[in-house]
UniProtKB/Swiss-Prot annotation:
The UniProt record lists the keyword Ribosomal protein: yes
Location within or outside the cell: Mitochondrion
Name this polypeptide is given: Small ribosomal subunit protein mS29
Subunit architecture: Component of the mitochondrial small ribosomal subunit (mt-SSU). Mature N.crassa 74S mitochondrial ribosomes consist of a small (37S) and a large (54S) subunit. The 37S small subunit contains a 16S ribosomal RNA (16S mt-rRNA) and 32 different proteins. The 54S large subunit contains a 23S rRNA (23S mt-rRNA) and 42 different proteins.
Family: Belongs to the mitochondrion-specific ribosomal protein mS29 family.
Positions bound to ATP: L150
Gene name, Swiss-Prot/TrEMBL: rsm23
Top-level division of the source organism's lineage: Eukaryota
Pfam entry (one): DAP3
Task of the protein: Component of the mitochondrial ribosome (mitoribosome), a dedicated translation machinery responsible for the synthesis of mitochondrial genome-encoded proteins, including at least some of the essential transmembrane subunits of the mitochondrial respiratory chain. The mitoribosomes are attached to the mitochondrial inner membrane and translation products are cotranslationally integrated into the membrane.
Length: 469
């Protein structure tokens, strides 16, 4: 019996367990104190009573209004951000004037003796290049006193071919290829500079992606599978007029055009024909009439034409536009793109001679398997290799229309500059006050090696990156 009674004592709740834990902690302390009635009343008023200490608090879901943030300035106007993003600064008055810097003359870019030298662009050519948007925001024009260019061996080779084509009435069709920041866009700028100084007519598309990424208006052409882009065409006509006004002022019309927005008699100034495009709706008709006038055969005074485009890969694919059946439109079905690809492939002949140049890009560029294959094939044929690259039989990314355009073009591959050209560039940077080191053989070899054997953009990054605004 005693054992059962002991077991009952073990399971019976003890008096100590019924005491709250807080009271045990307070009572078990070694400190003893007394409190007056006033202190006890204040304590109970502050804590709400000891009996309510363990009660759960109620959650309050009261919505609090956020304070309105007062704007410190007005929002940017429409187009202001884009204008700031595309802003081009071509001079810096704080930079030192380079002593002995010569200005380019019409034949300087085609002279072999000028390889490795830096020459300044004439002011009228700078205005024309700015009108055609040949300068890029990523180029470091704004840290020098005036815009100048380095004459490379590829520059001389290209301008010599342009000079011969203009004299013989032939057309060179070339694609400028190269790795990132090797100077492809700058070589296009030098070709345009040579054309402006020798009284050529220059038509330039600065960003091919603006034609194919569905960022501009488009409309179908009646009785044709092609599509026009009236707003972009009007903008192109206006920039073409500003850049070539000196040459166009000496030319008159030789054909009558019935579809123009206004009547233009025969033998009228060609500028009057361009000025007739006041609205976007009639821009494509005016552009067709202008192209016909510029390519008039057996007409004295018709200059050669330079037709150039930057960002070639963007037009060598299916565009982002859609037809009424919601099918994607191929880039070669856009009228402006079709004109350039016909000139590049040789389907459209320019009787007065000239050049058709397209430059590839590595920044923000889509992959075009057919274009890359065609470039590799043309380079293999030029090198005389027995095995020419062929299509991947398991890939469906090839485009017959792209390969037809690139079938007979010439490829100019840009690589790094030579050490002689690198020395001329570094000496110009040092004379401008941008390079605070002595230019000698060891320094030239160091910069040339660090830049991947003379890649111009990497040389700029290694030497002038801290000087950029």
């Amino acid at each position: 019996m005693s054992a059962s009674n002991c077991l009952r004592c073990l399971v019976r709740p003890s008096a100590v367990a019924l005491v709250p834990r807080q009271m045990l902690q307070v009572g078990g302390g070694s400190l003893t104190f007394t409190a007056t009635a006033a202190t006890k009343g204040a304590s109970s008023a502050n804590t709400g009573g000891r009996q309510n200490a363990n009660r759960p608090q109620k959650l309050r879901f009261k919505k609090t209004k956020k304070k309105n943030v007062v704007s410190s300035g007005k929002p940017p106007l429409p187009g202001e951000r884009k204008a700031y993003r595309k802003k081009i600064v071509l001079s810096n008055n704080n930079a030192l004037p380079v002593p002995g810097l010569e200005t380019l003359r019409p034949n300087d870019l085609a002279k072999q003796d000028n390889v490795g030298s830096v020459k300044a662009l004439p002011e009228d050519v700078v205005d024309a290049l700015r009108a055609m948007e040949a300068f890029k925001p990523t180029q470091c024009w704004g840290i020098f006193r005036q815009p100048s260019v380095l004459i490379r061996q590829e520059t001389v080779d290209l301008t010599k071919k342009m000079k011969a084509a203009g004299a013989d009435g032939k057309t060179i069709r070339m694609v400028i290829e190269g790795n990132r920041v090797t100077g492809k866009s700058l070589l296009l700028l030098q070709a345009m500079t040579h054309a402006f100084m020798n009284d050529w007519v220059v038509l330039h598309i600065p960003e091919a992606q603006e034609l194919t990424t569905a960022v501009t208006e488009y409309a179908p052409i009646e009785n044709s599978p092609l599509w026009t882009q009236p707003t972009y065409t009007l903008k192109l006509l206006q920039s073409f007029k500003r850049a070539n006004e000196k040459v166009l002022s000496r030319m008159n019309t030789v054909y009558s055009h019935a579809d123009l927005p206004q009547i233009i008699p025969v033998n009228s100034p060609l500028l009057q024909l361009i000025n007739s495009a006041k609205e976007a709706d009639g821009a494509w008709t005016v552009f067709q009439a202008l192209w016909r006038e510029l390519n008039a055969e057996n007409v004295p005074g018709r200059p050669p034409i330079l037709f150039s485009l930057d960002g070639l890969a963007h037009i060598m694919k299916v565009s982002d536009y859609r037809n009424p059946a919601f099918e994607l439109i191929h880039s070669h079905d856009l009228a402006l793109v079709k004109l350039f690809t016909d000139c590049l492939s040789g389907a459209t002949v320019m009787p007065n001679g000239g050049a058709v140049l397209g430059a590839t890009t590595r920044g923000n560029s889509p992959r075009s398997a057919s274009m890359e294959l065609a470039i590799a094939q043309r380079e293999a044929e030029k090198a005389g290799e027995k095995e020419v690259p062929q299509r991947d039989p398991y890939s469906k990314k090839y485009d017959d229309r792209v390969e037809a355009v690139m079938k007979s073009v010439e490829i100019l591959r840009l690589k790094g500059v030579s050490k002689t050209e690198a020395r001329g560039l570094l000496e110009y940077w040092a004379a401008s006050g941008m390079l605070k080191k002595r230019v000698d053989e060891s320094m030239v070899s160091e910069k040339w090696t660090l830049s991947g054997n003379g890649v111009v953009g990497e040389m700029e990054r290694a030497s002038l990156l801290t000087m950029k605004a």
